[in-house]
Design a protein with these regions (language model features):
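Bacterial Sec-dependent N-terminal signal peptides
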Residues: 1-22
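Short secondary-structure capping/junction motifs at helix and strand boundaries
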Residues: 3-4, 75-78, 175-176
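Short, small-residue-rich loop/turn micro-motifs
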Residues: 31, 138-142, 208
């Protein structure tokens, strides 16, 4: 009987673990005709650190990621965010309550990284930040940058450009965000499974205005 109970418990444990496995999320095509004009978006851009208790819709998430660092010229694979010598060194990690994903710009989808909610690690000691439904974390990949002498500054600049894309998009469609460089980097490196040569640069929590 004891052996049977052990088998039953093990079976349900496996089912539970499988139920927690993340699946690839196919994003919607971006709606390119939405939002304020470019000049109005610049006028409205400001930092906000409070969000409504509501998840982003799939369409808003899809548009946000495309604006951040999506492909806007499919024939060449070039991005909405320029990068040093077009090396496309910036990866965007999408941190949510359900877990963390890596944005695949070519497929315009989210690839699972971990089922752990890492928003508190991104927020560090600023606990209110962890309440944002989505936090985008920009990571540079130094090996992609051929000019190793300037890789540090190039990676930082490229990450900042993606962050600014996020800020302008949010201003243009009425979402709330704030660019931040503070995060628990050592813990995040482990959770995001970063390799040598990958560096956390900046993050943008995003949500609906409260």
């Amino acid at each position: 009987m004891k052996h049977l109970l052990t088998l039953v418990f093990g079976f349900f444990f496996i089912l539970t673990c499988k139920g927690q496995e993340l699946q690839t999320i196919k994003l919607n095509e971006p709606q390119k005709d939405r939002g304020f004009s470019v000049m109005q978006a610049f006028e409205k851009r400001h930092s906000e650190r409070v969000w409504a208790d509501k998840e982003l819709s799939l369409q808003d998430l899809s548009d946000l990621l495309w604006a951040a660092n999506g492909i806007n010229r499919p024939e060449t694979g070039k991005r909405t965010a320029p990068s040093s010598m077009n090396k496309q060194d910036i990866d965007v990690y999408v941190c949510m309550a359900r877990g963390t994903y890596l944005y695949d710009a070519k497929a315009h989808e989210l690839k699972p990284v971990t089922a752990i909610d890492v928003r508190a690690e991104v927020a560090a000691d600023q606990k209110e930040i962890a309440k944002a439904p989505v936090i985008l974390v920009m990571v540079t990949n130094y090996p992609r940058l051929s000019d190793s002498k300037n890789a540090l500054i190039s990676g930082a600049i490229d990450g900042g450009i993606v962050s600014e894309n996020i800020s302008i998009f949010c201003a243009g469609v009425g979402l709330a965000t704030v660019p931040r460089t503070w995060m628990n980097k050592e813990n995040l490196r482990s959770y995001l499974k970063l390799q040598e040569g990958q560096e956390l640069i900046i993050n943008n929590p995003v949500g609906y205005k409260k």
